[in-house]
Amino acid sequence: MQRRKLQITLISPKGPLYRYRGGIFKQSLRYMPLTLPTLAALVPKEIDAKITCIDEGIGDVDSNLDSDLVGMTVITGTASRAYELAAHFRSRKIPVVLGGPHVTLVPEDAQPHADSIVVGYAEDEWPRLLRDFAAGRMQSRYNQSEDFCLSGYPLPDRSVLPRWKYSTSNVFEASRACIHNCEFCVVPAAWGRKPFKKPVQAIVDDLRRQRARRAIFIDLNLISDKEYAAQLFEAITPLKIEWYGLATTMLCDDIPLLNLVARSGCRGLLMGLESISKRNLRQSSKGFNDPEKYPQIVARLHERKIALQGCFVFGLDEDTPEIFLQTARFAVDARIDLPRFAVVTPFPGTELHRRLEREGRILSRNWEKYDGQHVVFQPLQMSVEQLQRGTEAAWKYAYSWSHVSERLRYSAAPWHVALFTNLSYRYYANRLHQFYNCDWMSSPLWREPAPIAATPDSAVIR
């Protein structure tokens, strides 16, 4: 008699803003995430399993799905959705495992909603959990080992997600963590400041296996370890790829490294500029940013045909109602190729959250609103609604037709990339108001979701 395969379902939940059904985009403009392909590749070979992966950004979750185990990766903005899905599957006697940044930041919040949680990176603990589950002894919690490193693990299995539903599947990761300690950042709060690095040859092998001509590196700070970064850039130069990634503004102070970045094929970088106020930056422990140097940073990148996605946050303590248009105008005048704006979010477990909690300024613990576009705390020098509407105004100013057309003329990005990204962000800017509603502030406590009825006529969990 043939033994039945273990049915494992891996889900990446999404909040209302980015969900496939009812979200801001009719189709995904995202690149393929690496979490689900990584988790799928980590399933031990000795476990005969059928793995199903569902990304709610591109598809629906079937309420009647058949599975022996459901695993979900959770960020704070998707926690309420993850808990809703977990309650549904557990009501059907399907065990649920939760992991990811939110679970690592506040495991005590996630534990009641799951049969087991994984705290920290999953490379060691996810396979151990699966072996325990197969043997009937799954524990309630698995913690990342102290001697964790990123060597010796299988490459992500990108076949578990439909490539054609993403802008690209050529997504790669060389390192994790960041050496800085910015007050509002999740990374040092969840995983510390020690960079974890994959062997450079493993990255080269993955790029070759994917036959990538263009690539996105999702490392939060590619230059956390400059020596390692230089080795990586030297190694990928012969591949003659175009690549995009993330770095800090400090890269532009290191001209030899910046030249190597350009020579290796970099065509675009995301940098957290955050604010045009030096006092804001100092308070946020990001004093290495200097707004007076931002135009120089843009110029140095453009000289090397590297485009800049510059990210700003609003709601820091020095911000007044004038900051929104000041920042948007600055972004346009500085010729930033792709400005991006967000409401500063005090994610649980971060130093910012602890400070605002002490000051009595946290207004909501409805995790669904912790998405970078909703206000969940009391700003110091403006109202909640001013912060909410001002952020929307900055988006609309920066992505007016006149400013989009101006950017297309000077952008360092390839023309088709500049056109696609600017039109996508213009679309986003003009639909944000659909998701802005300050009425929820009158009820800051989390509303419990209604039970989901699993019936043949309603097989999609909305």
Regions from the PLM with identified roles:
Residues 13-20, 108-109, 180, 227, ...:
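Flexible glycine/acidic-rich beta-alpha junction loops that bind and position SAM and/or redox cofactors
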Residues 62, 67-76, 230-236, 240, ...:
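Short, electropositive alpha-helical surface patch
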Residues 155-309, 316, 322-329:
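Radical SAM [4Fe-4S] cluster-binding motif and immediate context
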